[in-house]
A protein has these predicted regions:
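Conserved class I S-adenosyl-L-methionine
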Residues: 162-191
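Class I SAM-dependent methyltransferase SAM/SAH-binding core
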Residues: 64-123
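Core SAM-dependent methyltransferase catalytic element
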Residues: 199-200, 208-225
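A short acidic, Gly/Pro-enriched loop at the edge of an enzyme's catalytic core
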Residues: 122-133
């Protein structure tokens, strides 16, 4: 387990400001005109960690892929470039993000390559064992009962399928200090990995990478055959 994290120093604590609740709520579930703006910002701010997730997924051309919390849809569109013979689905419980992704990638939608769905990941609208690969980025903070969501992802993944969960953990002290606990439930990395195991996955690896000013954690897991 990596231990390369440093706590905030005294100087850091003086300048850290907590994200306003209104903005934090938009980060969880973008809505209205402000949500449209947040969607644009999020697309830029999360691109690097999404690229890392695609690398960790080890996509094959015929893979069927699920993104939980598909947001702007840009990552799923990139995945479609690799999984060129597969089908790809994204689900998001923000109507703003669902509309934005559907419009932004309407070409892929029209071709039947990608489908964006409006809904919640604790009740996924997909058949058992429908996907070869699945991933979720910056979603776990917003799951009131994370085991329910993870169990659903396990249900729709095929045996020997691969799942990658990306998040900022409680060990990232700056993230914890600046994001209100009323909206963000920020758990330790080890606790998240244990939840993934309890959902039925085998945890293959846990990684940490510095992405700009963010310290990202990645849990790589597989569904046993």
């Amino acid at each position: 387990m990596p231990t390369d994290l440093a706590p905030l120093g005294r100087g850091d604590r003086k300048v850290v400001m907590r994200k306003p609740l209104m903005i934090a709520r938009q980060g969880r579930r973008p809505a209205g005109l402000l949500g449209e703006l947040v969607a644009r910002v999020m697309a830029r701010q999360t691109a690097a960690e999404n690229d890392i997730v695609l690398e960790l997924l080890q996509l094959d051309p015929a893979d069927c892929v699920l993104e939980v919390g598909s947001g702007h849809g840009d990552t799923l569109a990139k995945a479609a470039g690799v999984a060129s013979r597969g089908s790809l689905s994204g689900i998001d419980f923000s109507s703003v993000m669902h509309r934005r992704a559907s419009r932004r990638h309407r070409g892929l939608v029209r071709e039947g390559r990608v489908g964006f769905h409006f809904g919640n990941s604790d009740r996924l609208p997909y058949a058992d064992r429908a996907f070869d690969k699945a991933y979720a980025v910056h979603t776990v903070y917003f799951w009131a009962a994370p085991l329910e969501h993870l169990t659903e992802i396990h249900r729709v993944l095929r045996p020997d399928g691969r799942f990658v969960l990306a998040f900022r953990a409680a060990e990232d002290t700056r993230f914890r200090a600046t994001h209100p606990s009323e909206i963000y439930c920020i758990r330790p990395e080890g606790e998240i990995a244990d939840l993934v195991r309890r959902a039925g996955f085998d945890v293959v690896d846990t990684l940490r990478r510095t992405v700009g000013a963010k310290l990202m954690s990645f849990v790589v897991a597989g569904r046993p055959s």
